Amino acid sequence: MGILPISQSSFLADYPLTGSGESYALCGTFFTVGCLNVAEHLDTNLDGVNMSGKAYLERHKTTCHRALCPICWPDWANREKDRATERLKAFVLKGRVLKPIHLTVSVPNADYGLSLQGMREKAYRSLKMVHCIGGMMIYHSRRKNLDDVWYYSPHFHIIGYGWIIDVRRNYELSGYVVKNIGVRKTVEGTIFYQLSHAGISEKHHTITWFGCLSYAKLHVKYKEKEESICPICQERLHRLIWIGEGECELPDFEGVAFFDNPDNWMIKPNHLIYE
């Protein structure tokens, strides 16, 4: 009895992998945000440049933040990773800060036909049996074989907390294999890597939380995203449009500040602050 090729697979939970979909037309293209409030830029310096009468500019990349987008999936993964890391760090047990562990839970062949929710519920029970008290779960629908070809092999990656025991007893009772495989150099790196080839469903969250870290038991006040502001006058940055002569020659680099004649730019009608 073999495993069906991916194209022929009819398993309910055989979801496509991160980055395997199609991008939108603007994904990965760049746009400009900046500050034209040059009246407040008088007699100011930025990195050794006299900004008097100059517009402050930044280039940003357009992203759809979709997990299946082959261009923008890293932006989605980074956002998910940052939020998950905040939640993991917020957990303390009786005043003690614990070190996260990294587990896998592999689904037995007999349950391959279950829905994702059905497999998750059984995986949760196995984690409870081996004394994993809570954490985050990422679903992987496939593994690679020796020929570097993806095949259906549902399993879960867990980053959480606990003292893992009774693994053999759990396997004998449930058929689900729990392994403690250790974190990478950082928890953040582990989360990002696992998200990079997760099984993506449009109906289900890629990351779910359980046990002591579930939404019902752990309430976290997440950091609010900082507003994009001009480092010179502290005004909000606006989406800008080039109106100068010829083509805009600003290079497509993020994280770099530029300056220019403000006459070459205008605020985009119905402007949107870059988010």
Tell what function each PLM region has.
Residues 1-152, 161-275:
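Right-hand nucleic-acid polymerase module
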